[in-house]
């Protein structure tokens, strides 16, 4: 009997494990929406619009990251209900005054591909395009980044069409090492969009003073998730659908990857899957280089 009771209470503890936390600014005490949470380098989630997140599984180590704040790393046993992130100190950079009449250089979107011209990405994943500029754009400052999104039509179990459903993405920038994304140097504020609309995700980074070096930069669009009326994330039927092109640009060469963030071999060359799928549809298909459609504004 004692053994049965022990197993009963043990099962309740295991099945009922759940911890709720709030992530907030250590100075203002304001909650931080859509912070990235990683558990034991195996599981990833986000805080909601109120900075709240709930952990359903056992874990030993937690890491929280947020734009403009120092990373927070802790063991589970040391955690409190509210996790405070410390803002990074603002560093004044040396600024060179240039001629304001220098025109901006606009790199527009390339024409979308005829077949498989978009790809839905689910929460906790990212599409990343690595760009190597031609000589005239080397060391230009990146002013704006744009990603066009295709509208998504999807249905629930009763075949009711979802409309005007909000979701959240984020734009990331990485350095390049061995032609692959390396260190993250910028992450935008979370950006809301409507999944059932054609959207243009645009980020102004003119204050960041990020230059486009000879080896290039990688630009990613990360899907955080669909948001319900309570500000909570819903992973079911939750997608962003960036546009792809199969045209070559006179301003850069590029390669696009799918990034799953966690685990080994998390980067996947999108050309492999795109060309494989098209070869099943089109006889005598000629290999093409498929990349994210991206728009950039540069300044010398």
Model-derived regions, located:
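A short, solvent-exposed loop/turn motif at the edges and junctions
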Residues: 63-76
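PGST-rich, cysteine-poor low-complexity/disordered linker and tail segments that act as flexible spacers
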Residues: 245-300
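Surface-exposed turn/loop modules enriched in turn-prone residues
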Residues: 140-202
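Short, well-structured beta-strand segments enriched in hydrophobic/aromatic residues
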Residues: 205-246
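Short, ordered, surface-exposed loop/turn motifs in non-cytosolic proteins
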Residues: 27-41
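Short, acidic Ser/Thr/Gly-rich low-complexity loop/linker segments typical of extracellular
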Residues: 42-52
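Short, acidic, small-residue-rich periplasmic hinge/interaction motif at the N-terminus
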Residues: 65-67, 84-118
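A short, amphipathic beta-strand motif
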Residues: 19-27, 51, 83, 95
């Amino acid at each position: 009997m004692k053994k049965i009771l022990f197993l009963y209470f043990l099962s309740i503890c295991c099945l009922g494990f759940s911890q709720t936390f709030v992530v907030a600014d250590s100075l203002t005490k304001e909650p931080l929406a859509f912070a990235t949470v990683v558990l034991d380098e195996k599981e990833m989630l986000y805080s909601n619009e109120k900075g709240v997140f709930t952990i359903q599984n056992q874990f030993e180590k937690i890491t929280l990251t947020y734009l403009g704040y120092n990373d927070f790393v802790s063991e589970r046993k040391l955690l409190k209900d509210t996790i405070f992130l410390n803002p990074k100190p603002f560093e004044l950079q040396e600024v060179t005054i240039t001629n304001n009449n220098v025109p901006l250089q606009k790199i527009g979107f390339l024409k979308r591909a005829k077949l498989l011209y978009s790809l839905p990405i689910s929460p906790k994943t990212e599409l990343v395009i690595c760009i190597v500029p031609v000589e005239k754009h080397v060391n230009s400052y990146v002013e704006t980044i744009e990603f066009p999104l295709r509208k998504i039509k999807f249905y629930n179990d009763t075949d009711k069409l979802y409309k005007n459903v909000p979701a959240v993405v984020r734009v990331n920038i990485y350095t390049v090492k061995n032609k692959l994304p390396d260190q993250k140097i910028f992450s935008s504020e979370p950006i809301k969009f409507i999944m059932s609309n054609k959207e243009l995700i645009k980020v102004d980074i003119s204050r960041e003073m990020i230059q486009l070096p000879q080896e290039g930069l990688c630009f990613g669009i990360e899907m955080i998730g669909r948001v319900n009326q309570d500000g909570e994330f819903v992973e079911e039927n939750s997608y962003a659908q960036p546009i792809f092109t199969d045209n070559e640009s006179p301003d850069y060469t590029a390669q696009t990857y799918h990034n799953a963030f966690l685990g080994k071999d998390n980067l996947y060359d999108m050309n492999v899957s795109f060309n494989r799928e098209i070869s099943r549809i089109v006889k005598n298909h000629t290999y093409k280089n498929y990349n994210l459609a991206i728009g950039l504004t540069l300044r010398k």
